A protein has these predicted regions:
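Alpha-helical transmembrane segments
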Residues: 1-27, 57-87, 121-127, 134-137, ...
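Flexible loop linkers connecting adjacent transmembrane helices
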Residues: 25-41, 95-103, 296
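Juxtamembrane helix-capping/reentrant segments at transmembrane boundaries
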Residues: 36-49, 100-113, 303
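Hydrophobic alpha-helical hairpins/lids featuring a short glycine-rich hinge
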Residues: 71-106, 110-112
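Membrane interface segments of multi-pass transport proteins and intramembrane proteases
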Residues: 96-106, 136-145, 307
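Short, well-ordered, mixed-charge alpha-helical segments that flank or form enzyme active sites
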Residues: 97-98, 128-131
């Protein structure tokens, strides 16, 4: 358990210590944020703020994990999903930098690349020996829905949904980083409890979850260090690199914990953000009207003259409540029983 704590501390120290030089590097390279013309007017002031700060999160978390990991396939799979989704996000950021525009990698390429990530993740999950691999436990029940080969399609939806959901929420200073820390803390606590319960019951067939906890702690520490510089007014943005990486990490945890549907609660804020966009598009297309002033929904509250910090803190509170529900369901229905 000491490894878990040290991983978080190491990642946090690296992230905070390297932050100023990394931000200066981004400024020198003129890797600044491009702002959508149709976005809120007060976001114009954010133009040019260094972005792709997610690289700092990935570096700090990876170094801490490599230094303290037991190299179990469970933790390595989460690291793979995190880095792979981060690489897709970096490609998106790179196109924005080079073409000086707010749109990056095309949706078609993102889907193709995320499908490749999902296929490899499914293979690694199989190699890790997860029980009930191709079935999904329905939260609040003891029923497992058998998906068979469709499980691989399902985890693609989990990974793509989480990565893009966090990306949608990354529109206000501190919003995505703060909610991600809350979600990752929940998953890490789940991994720790599962490890403790499994360690006390040798008969349980459960891969070592300690590495999952180490990966989670490393990501939390790195994200906390990043938030130090991303809090309002932000000195740096995580960009698609960080947003997609953190979303991928959450999806990886949900898959390797066999708690895929709990992501609906633990990542509930991102689901709300994504649903707001879907509702807005559908109602405008078929009814010719808009439900929200602007989407994703955090922009709706901006248009209602809420301050950025008020929106950020309230979204953190919502994330905390939803994560508590997710954790309660995990404790009641997913945690291995005492013997």
């Amino acid at each position: 358990m000491t490894r878990v704590l040290i991983a978080g501390i190491v990642a946090g120290v690296i992230s905070i210590a390297a932050g100023p030089r990394f931000i200066d590097f981004l400024r020198r390279k003129e890797l600044g944020q491009q702002i959508r013309e149709e976005g809120p007017e007060r976001h114009v002031a954010k133009k040019g703020t260094p972005t792709a700060g997610g690289i700092l999160i990935l570096l700090a978390a990876t170094i801490a994990f490599i230094a303290l990991s037991k190299y179990e396939l469970t933790g390595l799979t989460v690291l793979f999903v995190t880095l792979a989704c981060g690489a897709i996000g970096f490609a998106d950021d790179f196109i924005k930098f080079t073409h000086k525009r707010s749109l990056g990698l095309s949706g078609r390429w993102k889907i193709l690349l995320l499908a490749c990530v999902a296929a490899i993740t499914g293979y690694l999950a199989h190699r890790a020996g997860l029980s009930h691999l191709t079935s999904v436990l329905i939260p609040g029940t003891s029923y497992r829905l058998p998906l068979g080969p469709l499980w691989y399609v399902f985890i693609f939806l989990v990974i793509a949904g989480a990565a893009n959901g966090v990306n949608l929420s990354d529109g206000l200073d501190g919003l995505a980083a703060g909610t991600a820390i809350i979600s990752l803390f929940t998953f890490t606590t789940m991994a720790v409890l599962t490890f403790i319960r499994s360690a006390r019951t040798p008969s349980l067939r459960s891969p070592d979850k300690l590495d999952l906890a180490i990966a989670g702690a490393a990501l939390i520490g790195a994200a906390v260090g990043f938030l130090w510089y991303n809090a309002f007014p932000a000195e740096v943005f995580m960009g698609d690199t960080g947003a997609m990486a953190l979303g991928g990490a959450m999806a990886g945890f949900a898959i390797m914990m066999k708690a895929e549907l709990l992501l609906l609660f633990i990542g509930g804020v991102y689901l709300i953000e994504a649903l707001s966009v879907i509702i807005q598009v559908l109602t405008f297309k078929y009814l010719g009207r808009r439900v929200f002033l602007m989407t994703p929904i955090h922009h709706h509250f901006e248009m209602k003259a809420w301050s950025e910090t008020k929106i950020m803190v309230r979204f953190w509170i919502v994330a905390g409540v939803l994560c508590s529900v997710g954790f309660a369901l995990f404790y009641l229905y997913y945690l291995p029983p005492r013997v």
